[in-house]
Swiss-Prot record:
Pfam families: S-AdoMet_synt_C (PF02773), S-AdoMet_synt_M (PF02772), S-AdoMet_synt_N (PF00438). It comes from Prochlorococcus marinus (strain SARG / CCMP1375 / SS120). The lineage of its organism: Bacteria, Bacillati, Cyanobacteriota, Cyanophyceae, Synechococcales. GO terms for biological process: one-carbon metabolic process; S-adenosylmethionine biosynthetic process. One of its GO terms (molecular function) is magnesium ion binding. Homotetramer; dimer of dimers. Mg(2+) binds at residue 17. Pathway: Amino-acid biosynthesis; S-adenosyl-L-methionine biosynthesis; S-adenosyl-L-methionine from L-methionine: step 1/1. InterPro entries: ADOMET_SYNTHASE_CS, S-AdoMet_synt_C, S-AdoMet_synt_central, S-AdoMet_synt_N, S-AdoMet_synthetase, S-AdoMet_synthetase_sfam. The gene is metK. It catalyses: L-methionine + ATP + H2O = S-adenosyl-L-methionine + phosphate + diphosphate. Residues 100-110 are annotated as: Flexible loop. This is S-adenosylmethionine synthase.
Length: 410
């Protein structure tokens, strides 16, 4: 097969869209922490000096939304003299939340196809299609380009938070291009980092000097540490390294661009390496299959790869609003499977319970915020929902399921 280059991007927690995802999920955490049966569909908008939260919420919880929003924005790094025009202390916070539609609630509360089984009584919160993916390119069974991009974004945020690079500001993006030969990653072709910074960097004020200093620092303190344990590493003489290609990046965050919840769905998943059903995750409670079924689809795909039944798997699920059982299940192994796609699909149908109620129960999706000191989804909202070695995510824990699948084939 001819060689090709595949590219994926990530963004830091200070990117305007990611601020919104984290705010929406912090609100979800706070509501589920007090009332695990909360129904939440929370959208956030940020712009210069403004944060608006809107959507639908039905919950017994009592939450100080305004203070919570300010706390999230402050933790990201938008406060004080280095706030870059967006300050947690002074921005306006508007709350416009309504109750969930009773027409939607009745279908979720009592599924159209229920049979007395409690899992049959929870219908899907909406129609839709969801995809899950896994491959053997990394230890966490994720595509290498998005895995690398997230590593760089996390490291970029770390050296900002710990003061290693004091001139860095919260907004930033990374992009990684990987060379593939015979469908296997063989080299890192290009790394791009765009990072917000102060107007003066280490006493340097010229645009050229600032970019040179940032490039030097990022290679040594971000790129090298983020990739040191990988078999495929960037090589300074061969890997193209681009930093702030426009020259400078002083105005950023909500001061530079408006942000919205759900605009980084490819960053949240597989970096474009697999298909996406179109539904965002953040701000949605587990009855929304956009979120819970996408987590389940990842669990299925990762289990199949971990069991050695294929080296690359994509799983599609579809649902109808108010109906518990999936409308369809499809497994595609791209020729890498030890059995046909039809046989893999049958195996999944027989071994995985993909009703929303069962997914919620298996992963503990309603109780996780309470079990983890009031915050869970907020931590997942930045740097990807899958393949997270830094977080203990239930849909990533496939060891036992992989063993079950292996045993089922004996």
């Amino acid at each position: 097969m001819p060689s090709f280059v595949f590219t994926s991007e990530s963004v830091t927690e200070g990117h305007p869209d990611k601020i919104c995802d984290q705010v929406s999920d912090a609100i979800l955490d706070a509501l589920l922490d007090q009332d695990p049966n909360s129904r939440v569909a929370c959208e956030t908008v940020v712009n210069t000096g403004l944060c608006l939260i809107t959507g639908e919420v039905t919950s017994k919880a009592k939450v100080d939304f305004i203070n919570l929003v300010r706390e999230v924005i402050k933790e990201i790094g938008y406060f004080g003299a280095k706030a870059g025009g967006f300050d947690s202390n002074s921005c306006s916070v508007l709350v416009a939340l309504d109750q969930q539609s009773p027409d939607i609630a009745q279908g979720v509360d009592e599924a159209d196809d229920h049979s007395g089984n409690p899992f049959d009584q929870v219908g899907a919160g909406d129609q839709g299609i969801m995809f899950g993916f896994a491959c053997d390119e990394t230890p966490e069974l994720m595509p290498l380009p998005i895995s690398l991009a997230h590593r760089l974004s996390r490291r970029l945020a770390k050296v900002r938070h710990d003061g290693t690079l004091k001139y860095l500001l919260p907004d930033g993006k990374t992009q990684v291009s990987v060379l593939y030969e015979n469908n296997k990653p063989t080299a890192i072709d290009t790394i791009l980092i765009s990072t917000q910074h102060t107007a003066e960097v280490e006493g340097i004020t010229s645009e050229k000097g600032i970019r040179e200093q940032i490039s030097k620092d990022l290679w040594e303190l971000v790129v090298k540490p983020a990739t040191e344990d990988l078999p495929i590493k960037p090589i300074q003489e061969k890997t193209r390294f681009l930093v702030n290609p426009t020259g400078k990046f002083v105005v950023g965050g909500p001061q530079g661009d408006a942000g919205l919840t759900g605009r980084k769905i490819i960053v949240d998943t597989y970096g474009g390496y697999a298909r996406h059903g179109g539904g965002a995750f953040s701000g949605k409670d587990p009855t929304k299959v956009d979120r819970s079924a996408a987590y389940a689809a990842r669990f299925v795909a990762k289990s199949l790869v971990a069991a050695g039944l294929a080296s690359r798997v994509e799983v599609q699920l579809s649902y109808a609003i108010g109906v518990a059982n999936p409308v369809s299940i499809l497994v595609e192994a791209f020729g890498s499977g030890k059995m046909s796609n039809e046989a893999l699909t049958e195996l999944v149908t027989e071994n995985f319970d993909l009703r929303p109620g069962a997914i919620i129960e298996q992963f503990g999706l309603r109780s996780l915020p309470n079990q983890r000191q009031g915050r869970f989804y907020r931590d997942v909202a930045a740097y990807g929902h899958f393949g997270r070695p830094d977080l203990n995510l239930p849909w990533e824990d496939v060891q036992d399921k992989a063993k079950e699948l292996i045993e089922s084939q004996k």
